[in-house]
Curated annotation (Swiss-Prot):
May be involved in transcriptional regulation. Transmembrane segments: none annotated. GO terms for molecular function: DNA-binding transcription factor activity, RNA polymerase II-specific; RNA polymerase II cis-regulatory region sequence-specific DNA binding; zinc ion binding. PROSITE patterns: KRAB, ZINC_FINGER_C2H2_1, ZINC_FINGER_C2H2_2. Belongs to the krueppel C2H2-type zinc-finger protein family. PANTHER family: ZINC FINGER PROTEIN (PTHR24404), ZINC FINGER PROTEIN 501 (PTHR24404:SF100). The gene is ZNF534. This is Zinc finger protein 534. InterPro entries: Ikaros_C2H2-ZF, KRAB, KRAB_dom_sf, Znf_C2H2_sf, Znf_C2H2_type. Residues 8-92 form the KRAB domain. SMART domains: KRAB (SM00349), ZnF_C2H2 (SM00355). It comes from Homo sapiens. It comes from the Eukaryota.
Length: 674
């Protein structure tokens, strides 16, 4: 049975764009579009009658002698000018024409009953006269429509010209399907079967029947949305990544953490930082059980167990487990210090070192200890400080078994065993194990004391000394003993105090066998045996075993009494005297005797009292061998042998061997009866 004649419109082989889509194409894509359209149009025209002009459309009453498709494309004009310039009217038989244009082929090509005209988006319709319906079956088979099974080879009525046309159409589809988003080339009957458009574009909401059309659409969006950094030339596919990158150049850090005030240029960095304050460490190492806040830190830590060090320095051969460590190491060879402080001009190899240094000028200490409230400029310092409260000392010396809070302290301790003192002072020749110790020592020769107390004007060589001194004014004592609740201004004092509860006495004198809780006390004790007094007063020539005694003695000449009681205003030359005096106001007697329970306001009084229970008398007179429990009483006794009477009455000039006798004598003049 013969089928009605079919019509094929130009839109079946056209590549269509909306006006918005056309603007998205770059010049190269637009040029390719024109070339393809010219080829499509000329191929279709070549299938018509011989006398059809190359510039004339084979259409329903439409001929473009001056405004033809080829001339439009050859002039490189945009397809949108055609829509605005062409005026279409209806001719008497109801078909559309361009005003003032005639074609002798229009009635012949478009008069068959049942013909359908398909318009493209410009309002132009191209109709091709076909004698039978079978060629559409061939087209359907070419494009794989499962609803029609008849092949072109089954029907001998298809002419070579018609087969040639479908070959052209297949060629156009196969060659240009990846360059543009196509209007479908399938016949109208197959379009009926494919009415659903399940593939939607997220950019503008347009939907497509096949996934390849959506893919081609997304390629245009991606090509249109490439972002190039004008500062460094780096290219990004998303606007969000481009915006993040630009903050590197501008220094913008819009994400702020409210706890410590630290700012970040990415939200992910803020999320990582929050784990520092929360203490969250979700990443666990199965080898040793150590936990980490970030997966990257865990991966880096694992290399300790494997011993993997893939990053090697070409200069010295030293290997590193992470690339950043190698990068930091290379600066040592180049000597480069690109990061300079704008406040003081000091330069640094690493940005992190500069950031740490800047807290010296700002005084910023954003990392707070939850136990005692102490602030730190670096998170590493806070982590190390926390071990003071927990008592954790994870770093152990393999030589002697001594344990330490930090790895740096263990490294410094190891040099005791190795005897390495690489850092030598050019002034006096003294050698030190660490560079920081040498730097601190050099201040002795220069006399420089750069750290000044704002309250009293006292200056110090070291910042730590100033920090400890400031606690005298503030009364701050952040270190607390868990056994008795006593508080201290310095951690070293707390550690020293703890040995009272444990009874630990590690340091023993080889001369007399006496043991001490602190090495400094042992060193002071040794001077008793040697008789060495290296510290001399420039004013009176008096010599002392300890530098602290010399400093204390100088106050006698200057009359300086920098320590003042907040309760009564009384001033003292020594801080220990002030601390002792405060017990008068508080009535506190923190020192208790384990034998009888008697309490004392001073530790020295407790030590003196203990000798009552032990019967110990350590102080012996060399003249008569008499022994005393106190050194002060031995000193008084010596005056008997020497005849020295250092205590003089201001009223009558009478002298006495003891201060107590002088006080008793003075009551005669004042007529006081003690």
């Amino acid at each position: 049975m013969a089928l009605t004649q079919g019509q094929l419109s130009f839109s079946d082989v056209a590549i269509e764009f909306s006006q918005e889509e056309w603007k998205c194409l770059d010049p190269g894509q637009k040029a390719l579009y024109r070339d393809v359209m010219l080829e499509n149009y000329r191929n279709l025209v070549s299938l018509g009658e011989d006398n059809v002009r190359p510039e004339a459309c084979i259409c329903s009453g439409i001929c473009l002698p001056d405004l033809s498709v080829t001339s439009m494309l050859e002039q490189k004009r945009d397809p949108w000018t055609l829509q605005s310039e062409v005026k279409i009217i209806n001719n008497p038989d109801g078909r559309e024409c361009i005003k003032g244009v005639n074609t002798e082929k229009s009635s012949k090509l478009g008069s068959s009953a049942g013909n359908k005209s398909l318009k493209n988006q410009h309002g132009l319709t191209l109709q091709l006269h076909l004698t039978e319906w079978q060629p559409f079956q061939a087209v359907r088979n070419i494009y794989g429509c499962k609803h029609v099974e008849k092949s072109i080879s089954d029907n001998s009525s298809v002419s070579p010209v018609q087969i040639s046309f479908f070959s052209v159409k297949t060629h156009i589809f196969n060659n240009y399907r990846n360059d543009f988003l196509f209007s479908t080339l399938l016949p109208q009957e197959q379009k009926v079967h494919i009415r659903e458009k399940p593939y939607g574009c997220n950019e503008h909401g347009k939907v497509f029947r096949v996934s390849s059309s959506l893919t081609n659409r997304q390629v245009i969006h991606i090509a249109d949305k490439t972002y190039k950094c004008s500062d460094c030339g780096e290219i990004f596919s998303s606007n969000s990544n481009f915006a993040q990158h630009q903050r590197i150049h501008t220094g913008e850090k819009p994400y702020k953490y409210n706890e410590c005030g630290k700012v970040f240029n990415q939200n992910s960095h803020l999320a990582q930082h929050q784990k520092i304050h929360t203490g969250q460490k979700p990443y666990n190492n199965k080898e040793c059980g150590k936990v980490f806040s970030h997966h990257a830190y865990l991966a880096q830590h694992r290399k300790i167990h494997t011993g993997e060090k893939p990053y090697k320095c070409s200069e010295c051969g030293k290997a590193f487990s992470v690339c950043s460590s190698l990068t930091a190491h290379l600066v040592i060879h180049t000597g480069e210090k690109p990061y300079d402080c704008k406040e003081c001009g000091k330069v640094f190899r690493h940005k992190s070192s500069l950031t740490t240094h800047q807290t010296v000028h700002t005084g910023e200490r954003p990392y707070k200890c939850n136990e005692c409230g102490k602030g730190f400029s670096r998170i590493a310092f806070l982590a190390r400080h926390r071990k003071v409260h927990t008592g954790e000392k994870p770093y152990k010396c393999n030589e002697c078994g001594k344990v330490f809070i930090g790895n740096s302290r263990l490294a410094r301790h190891r040099k005791i065993h190795t005897g390495g003192r690489r850092y030598k002072c050019n002034e006096c020749g003294k050698a030190f194990r660490t560079c920081s110790d040498l730097t601190a020592h050099l201040l002795i020769h220069t006399g420089e004391k750069p750290y000044e107390c704002i309250d009293c004007g006292k200056v110090f060589r070291h910042k730590s000394s100033l920090t400890y001194h400031c606690r005298i004014h503030t009364g701050e004592k952040p270190y607390k003993c868990n056994e008795c609740g006593k508080v201290f201004s310095q951690n070293s004092n707390l550690q020293r105090h703890r040995k009272i509860h444990t009874g630990e006495k590690l340091y023993k004198c080889n001369e007399c066998g006496k043991v001490f809780r602190q090495n400094s006390h042992l060193a002071q004790h040794r001077d008793i045996h040697t008789g060495e007094k290296p510290y001399s007063c420039n004013e009176c020539g008096k010599v002392f075993r300890r530098n602290s005694h010399l400093v204390r003695h100088r106050n006698v000449h200057t009359g300086e009494k920098p320590y003042s009681c907040n309760e009564c205003g009384k001033v003292f030359s020594r801080n220990s005297h002030l601390a002792r005096h405060r017990n008068i106001h508080t009535g506190e007697k923190p020192h208790s005797c384990n034998e009888c329970g008697k309490v004392f306001s001073r530790n020295s009084h407790l030590a003196r009292h203990r000798k009552i229970h032990t019967g110990e008398k350590l102080y012996k007179c060399n003249e008569c061998s008499k022994v005393f429990s106190r050194n002060s009483r031995l000193a008084q006794h010596r005056n008997i042998h020497t005849g020295v009477k250092p205590y003089s009455c201001n009223e009558c000039g009478k002298v006495f061997s003891k201060n107590s006798i002088l006080v008793q004598h003075c009551s005669i003049h004042t007529r006081e009866k003690p």
